[in-house]
A protein has these predicted regions:
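Feature 926 captures the class I aminoacyl-tRNA synthetase adenylation module centered on the KMSKS loop
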Residues: 1-149
Length: 149
């Protein structure tokens, strides 16, 4: 389940969604927004390494020691913080990204090709800049899900 989360959810959906904000090469995001994305990626890397340490001891030791100059095997195992975020769920993001990627593929386009317009439910409003940057959306509106390639 951890491998599936890292590979299929975290990498495929979260990292793809925030990488434009983390790099901020086109200056679409404020410094605070960009720093927030990088901090979250850093936090996730640290905790994913701790979760993987029992099954990949040598690799996680090497990476963790290189980044933090500590032995990961003496660090505390991460705890669930119990916080939930209302609004957009992981399933919502996965469904939206998959629908966009499928629409582009069906039209013979690459994932980095522009999307002429996208209409999404209002709950995605806080992610507007990330969606536009990640999917190269020309026009984003709110309502029922409609994808125009």
């Amino acid at each position: 389940r951890l491998k599936h989360f890292i590979w299929e959810t975290f990498s495929s959906h979260y990292v793809e969604l925030v990488k434009a904000r983390a790099y901020n090469s086109e200056n679409r995001f404020t410094k605070e927004e960009s720093d927030g994305a990088r901090w979250t990626l850093y936090y996730c890397l640290e905790n994913l390494l701790k979760l993987l340490a029992p099954v990949l001891p040598m690799m996680t030791y090497y990476i963790y020691h290189h980044l933090w100059k500590k032995d990961i095997h003496f660090e505390k195992f991460p705890n669930v913080n119990g916080k939930t975020i209302k609004g957009v769920t992981t399933e919502d993001i996965t469904m939206l990204n998959s629908a966009i990627w499928r629409a582009k593929k069906d039209k013979g386009l690459g994932l980095r090709d522009d999307l002429s317009s996208l209409e999404v439910p209002l709950k995605f409003k806080p992610m507007e800049k990330d969606l536009v940057a990640a999917h190269r959306i020309k026009t984003l509106t709110y309502g029922e899900l409609t994808i125009s390639v």
